[in-house]
Design a protein with these regions (language model features):
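Conserved nucleotidyltransferase catalytic core and NTase-mimicking acidic/glycine-rich helix/loop elements
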Residues: 2
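A polyanion-binding, active-site-adjacent surface
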Residues: 5, 10-215
Length: 215
């Protein structure tokens, strides 16, 4: 079934065998709905950096407040800035398809957020000063959600969480840790749209995620 899902997602040219890896089951106390959403209410008018002056909407993140899987992107794009939700464009639709293929949805078992909560102008990379101002918010989200696995989507998210300025290919295929929580790094869905040859490796990453979490 997963082979067929892989073909449906990426086409026959990206077909690869599925390699099972033993999962590691972690148990953490989970927050109530009120804890994560009351935190959202307390910060959604943030003006700690210049991004707060130019945004349309603060994009806190969305999903299951008891998520096993926390996905972290780099920052909101144009559509996200207008709608106030993460990953709502073409890249978001691709991400939804990948999640569905491993038995997840953004409303069940998954929470999606970004390194910065406001759109950088012209979709540029967030500046170090902007990341610094926003990082306490992500830290608090992680503390409240207590995911079993964090997955950084793309180079910016990866190097921010790892605190290492290295190539994405050097971050992949290794389990790192963020505040004792396992952390993996994979390609951002937008990169897959620009370079379809990355889809096969990304699918392997999500197979690992599925097996790690025991889906």
């Amino acid at each position: 079934a997963f082979i067929n899902q892989h073909i449906d997602l990426f086409g026959k040219e990206f077909y690869s065998d599925i390699y099972k890896k033993p999962g590691i089951r972690l148990t953490n106390p989970k927050p109530t709905n009120e804890s994560i959403f009351s935190f959202k209410s307390s910060i959604e008018n943030c003006k700690r950096c210049n991004l707060g002056m130019t945004r349309n909407k603060f994009v806190f993140g969305s999903g299951d407040p008891k998520a096993d899987l926390l996905l972290v992107g780099e920052g909101p794009g144009e559509k996200e800035d207008l709608q106030g939700e993460p990953f709502v464009g073409r890249a978001g639709k691709l991400l939804d398809r990948i999640l569905k293929a491993i038995g997840y949805t953004r409303k069940k078992k998954v929470f999606i957020t970004n390194i910065v909560k406001c759109r950088p102008p012209d979709n540029r990379d967030p500046l170090p000063s902007e990341v610094k101002e926003c990082s306490p918010y992500l830290d608090k989200q992680i503390d409240l959600i207590k995911p079993k696995l964090i997955v950084a989507l793309g180079r910016v998210a990866g190097k921010t969480l790892l605190q290492k300025d290295i190539l994405l290919k050097e971050m992949r295929n290794e389990t790192h840790y963020f505040n004792s929580i396992p952390l993996r790094v994979t390609y951002h869905p937008a990169a897959l749209l620009r370079n379809p040859s990355l889809k096969n490796e990304t699918w392997k990453d999500f197979q690992y995620i599925r097996d790690f979490l025991g889906s």
